[in-house]
Amino acid sequence: MAVEKKIKVLMVDDLEVAVMAIEHIVNQQPDMVLYASAANPYDAVKVISREKPDVILLDIQMPKMDGITFLRKIMSQHPVPVIMFSSVAEKGSANAIKALQ
C-alpha cells in the first residue's frame, strides 16, 4: 500500500489565536498538515530553509517585516505557492491588491 504524501503547510502569522484556528482547519483535511508556524518572516526563513513547505499561508500585516515585503524576498529564493490573508479588513484589502500587482 502506497503512503500518500500530505501537503505541508507553513503558516506565518504573529497572532497565536489565528495560528491555532488555521491549524485546526488545515489538519482536518486528510491530504494536508500544518507542519510548522512562524511568528514573523525572519523565523519563517529558517523554517523554509530547513524543510521546504508545499504552500505558505502568509499574514499581510506583521511586526518586523510585512507579508508583502517577505513575499517578494522569499519568491526570489524559494518559489512556493503562497496564500495571503489579513485579519485587518480595511488595511488588509489595500495591501492584498498591492501584493497581486
Residues covered by each model-derived region:
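Alpha4 helix (beta4-alpha4-beta5 surface) of REC/receiver domains from two-component response regulators
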Residues: 6, 69, 89-101
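Active-site residues of response regulator receiver
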Residues: 13, 59
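Acidic catalytic/metal-coordinating carboxylates
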Residues: 40-43, 66-69
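Active-site beta3 strand of CheY-like receiver
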Residues: 51-57
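Hydrophobic/aromatic residues positioned on beta-strands within the core alpha/beta folds
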Residues: 85-87
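Non-catalytic signal-transmission and effector/linker regions of two-component phosphorelay proteins
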Residues: 1-8
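Receiver (REC) domain active-site loop signature in two-component systems and cognate sites
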Residues: 62
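Short hydrophobic/Thr-rich beta-strand motif most characteristic of the beta2 strand and flanking loop
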Residues: 31-39, 47
